[in-house]
Amino acid sequence: MSELLSVALFLASVLIYAWKAGRNTWWFAATLTVLGLFVILNITLYASDYFTGDGINDAVLYTLTNSLTGAGVGKYILPGIGIALALVAVFGALGWVLRRRRHHPHHVGYSLLALLLALGSVDASPAFRQITELVKSQMRDGDPDFAVYYKEPAKTIPNPKLNLVYIYGESLERTYFDNDAFPNLTPELGALKNEGLDFSHTMQLPGTDYTIAGMVASQCGIPLFAPFEGNASASVSSFFPQNICLGDILKNSGYQNYFVQGANLRFAGKDVFLKSHGFDHLYGAEELKTVVADPSYRNDWGFYDDTVLDEAWKKFEALSRSGQRFSLFTLTVDTHHPDGFISRTCNRKRYDYDGKPNQSFSAVSCSQENIAEFINKIKASPWFKDTVIVVSSDHLAMNNTAWKYLNKQDRNNLFFILRGDKPQQETLAVKRNTMDNGATVLDILGGDNFIGLGRSSLSGQSLSEVFLNVKEKVLAMKPDIIRLWNFPKEIKDFTVDRDKNMIAFSGSHFRLPLLLRVSDKRVEPLPESEYSAPLRFQLADFAPRDNFVWIDRCYKMAQLWAPALALSTDWCVSQGQLGGQQTVQHVDKAQWQGKTAFKDTMIDMERYKGNVDTLKIVDNDIRYKADSFIFNVAGAPEEVKQFSGISRPESWGRWSNAQLGDEVKIEYKAPLPKKFDLVITAKAFGDNANRPIPVRVGNEEQTLVLGHDVSTITLHFNNPTDANTLVIAPPAPVSTNEGNILGHSPRKLGIGMVEIKVVNVEG
């Protein structure tokens, strides 16, 4: 209703000003500004909805204040460009319409009415309401009800008798199981759901709407609110250290806790969270690649669900035979937005909707078949009678190719339980949320019926029942939840552990690299993750007088303040203010001691602007002084004009990537020498090993042969045509996720380059 009202007020404002207000520069500017704000708010809402499927939420607010670059956004570039172009077009059209009758005499009354209507349209818009509530949540000091409803459970279960299998289905919300809306989409898992305790109204709350947040909510009974973007939590060394979560209780009760997934455990700090809360046995992409039957059978995120669930079954079987008490948690990935993935063992690899194939629905149908097969193996085993099986979505689906169809339904998370000891078939329509999942499981296992803000849906009352405005209530508790992290409020002395890649200060530990914004009584950690901007881009958003401590590889800060370290991949510490003085110190000891020293100096805005501009230079445009192309640092030597077909820097060097260009091309500013040696230190990937690799300069071509290990080879070139471009053409680029960033499309790797040097032998 508010959406229609806001649009009506917007149109009324435009019409009244365009046809009645007449000519006045001030009123025109004011009205256009407010109407433009309405347009920006609604485009922001649309864009946020595209990324999150949940409007302008907490994650979007973080992104608006911390620029997002890098991983996982490739498939959203075109929509982003489209939105930007639409914004320019709408502003231009709006200005043209408002000035249609600019030659008419000015009328103050109509101008004022148009401006008030424009202000009303902004105030009534859902986007403004969502942003206002989020900003309020940042300003609050907490909610008195938090202390009333936050409850810490007993640390043990008396006399536990049941093992636990807990399956997180990636984005596998309950809406998919509506057979009227999506006929025969989930027949196998849907049949199992109908055999157990099925909780039909599990809502999603703020801070529980992505994978690690959903896991924290379901095990600790709290949303994932932190002083940094949630997926960046991989940089912390402990995760809600004060909380008692389900894994802690299970471990204290004699359970061996296992977690199995196909993606890398480091992503979003799942390894840190699980290790902090009772899990000693973790298996992700790195751990599984040495045990799975086919290590190359992977999707963009890791191993397919059929592989992961097969390994989970092996773990279940071995643990059951051992007779020890255990919990086995597993997380699928094939239903990850925006498209999903189809494993090769599914019987149904295609699901049509509206008369055409839909990739997301197809992935759901396939993944649920894999999950059902895993559950049926457990049910058919002699150990099911001692087992509780839980199936839940980690969060509602984000904007995938099925999302617009999901939004036409009443959306809820999936949560159902199959008890081998006490079969029970019932659909429970009690209002609840994902924070109640862990407490419900704990209740069944014989423990308390509460964890944090979560309550058992079998014997307690959910906050979703207590508060009609439960979403606003949870946002009001955000400061209370952030305080549970027990983050330090100051930094004076700190220690960098060079070998463990850690920094410690005020009793807290963080993984490197790390950026800290330091103010009175607050230290804000800004980690680097797959979904956050590189730290130098985050630093570029700092105000001129903001104090910072930046711990990163030396070459990343050298271009600004330490040119001598431009090729160093060691750790360095920089601190200061972007508009004032900065220092760079080389970490030259295994345990390096540092102190903060922020000088109260005069702010130089020219210096500030220069620092910001330099920080924002993209990697490929960075240039350094060197007599060779060093591939494990960003950029290229000053002599290089441009290059293509080369992937990002890694610790050892860079791969060629045919997705970025069929050949490696390095164009120099000046012609290469008439006669020179080309010294190449490199290795080959896959079928490119031990095969001739053409290397061209002008009309002359040599061949390079590389093995799987790094070697150095010298080629002799004549360059009579004064060519300035070096071309290397790997013969058989291999599509692979080897070394890839999670969620990125596979790279096509050919050769791995460590260093290329041109040695002039002319004369």
Swiss-Prot record:
It catalyses: a phosphatidylglycerol + a membrane-derived-oligosaccharide D-glucose = a 1,2-diacyl-sn-glycerol + a membrane-derived-oligosaccharide 6-(glycerophospho)-D-glucose. It comes from the Bacteria. The chain crosses the membrane at residues 1-21, 26-46, 77-97, 108-128. One of its GO terms (biological process) is glucan biosynthetic process. GO terms for molecular function: phosphatidylglycerol-membrane-oligosaccharide glycerophosphotransferase activity. Pfam families: DUF7024 (PF22895), Sulfatase (PF00884). Its main location: membrane. One of its GO terms (cellular component) is plasma membrane. Belongs to the OpgB family. This is Phosphoglycerol transferase I. It comes from Salmonella schwarzengrund (strain CVM19633).
